[in-house]
Amino acid sequence: MDTLRALEPLHRACQVCNLWPWRLAPPPDSEGILLRRSRWLELYGWTVLIAATSFTVYGLFQESSVEEKQDSESTISSIGHTVDFIQLVGMRVAHLAALLEALWQRQAQRGFFAELGEIDRLLSKALRVDVEAMRINMRRQTSRRAVWILWGYAVSQLLILGAKLLSRGDRFPIYWISYLLPLLVCGLRYFQIFNATQLVRQRLDVLLVALQQLQLHQKGPAVDTVLEEQEDLEEAAMDRLIAVRLVYQRVWALVALLNRCYGLSMLMQVGNDFLAITSNCYWMFLNFRQSAASPFDILQIVASGVWSAPHLGNVLVLSLLCDRTAQCASRLALCLHQVSVDLRNESHNALVGTLVRYCAPLIILVPLQITQFSLQLLHQRLHFSAAGFFNVDCTLLYTIVGATTTYLIILIQFHMSESTIGSDSNGQ
């Protein structure tokens, strides 16, 4: 079972949602899966993209005409309608960005899984890793995560849709159904990003275990046969170190492909989540301030809080997963300098900077490989980027919290100043 076959259910779902334009074709002489170009899937994707763009533009013009007829509605209802419209537009823009990136970066998606296959072959041959068991475990974990995420989305959106169906107005059912469809596609795009990042982290964990088991020096009795075995073990350890270094080089290239495949989606999705969280918090503040403590008002406040939960969960999981994956490179560097060496051995003593001109190949190989691998870990650091605008890690959470707090303070101050001016004018 290769990685593509292990993730076949996910790819089938992404094909339906226009997030995977490749056709999965089994080769005639093996059990794997090949990626074949499908013009029908590409035509399907471009058709849905054009239709979604037209629907979004039509919704913008329709909303502008509706706002001209709603001068008589209250301030709180007007603000609530504006908040809903902002989130609807943000979700549709994120949906369009995901569809466009899936079509535009289809070659990068193919290169990602091709590079992943090369990494698995190196792990299987050079490091003797049971890649088959790793893929089976990955498929089980992916299925389990998909069930939990789908359950969370279903519960939150059913509560939101129920609250809006009970509200005043005849256009809410169509309004929210048109919102839920892009939301599910964006959620599936998030799951694609989670899965790709988890694939990278799984390979880094294998490298970390291999490096922790690496020993260049093992104590034993000074017997000729034992010394010969010791030299064989050291040579095997050097081969293992070279393999770890080569695999890390490919993992670094794999992360670069991941940033190409999903960078624009991460940028637009995180931006949309920021808008949704900020607008929902502002709307909840207004409801708390002006609600009459009726069951309907409480339901609206709870629905707004639940509405923010998927957006907050997506940003939280994405930031933590990317940050922990990037930290694996730092752990590799720490493990590299904890490799057991014998300073009395000339080949190992060369690690501190002394090289013998006339020596065996192993004597030169040890310091060169460790030193070069250390420099490689220093300069080829793993980072997940949202189209080059910002890095996705735990600092993103702090930035979003700070920006949300700042904008909420500004919006609340504007609202309170407008209320004060309105009350003064009514008093006069």
Curated annotation (Swiss-Prot):
One of its GO terms (cellular component) is membrane. Residues 1-40, 167-173, 272-300, 371-395 are cytoplasmic. Pfam families: 7tm_7. Probable gustatory receptor which mediates acceptance or avoidance behavior, depending on its not yet determined substrates. The chain crosses the membrane at residues 41-61, 146-166, 174-194, 251-271, 301-321, 350-370, 396-416. It comes from the Eukaryota. Belongs to the insect chemoreceptor superfamily. Gustatory receptor (GR) family. Gr2a subfamily. Disulfide bonds: none annotated. It is a multi-pass membrane protein. Glycans are attached at N195, N345. InterPro entries: 7TM_chemorcpt. One of its GO terms (molecular function) is taste receptor activity. Its main location: membrane. It is found in: Cell membrane. Residues 62-145, 195-250, 322-349, 417-428 are extracellular. Expressed in neurons of the terminal external chemosensory organ, the dorsal external chemosensory organ, as well as in the dorsal pharyngeal sense organ of larvae. GO terms for biological process: chemosensory behavior; detection of chemical stimulus involved in sensory perception of taste; male courtship behavior; monoatomic ion transmembrane transport; sensory perception of taste. Keywords: Cell membrane, Glycoprotein, Membrane, Receptor, Transducer, Transmembrane, Transmembrane helix. This is Putative gustatory receptor 2a.
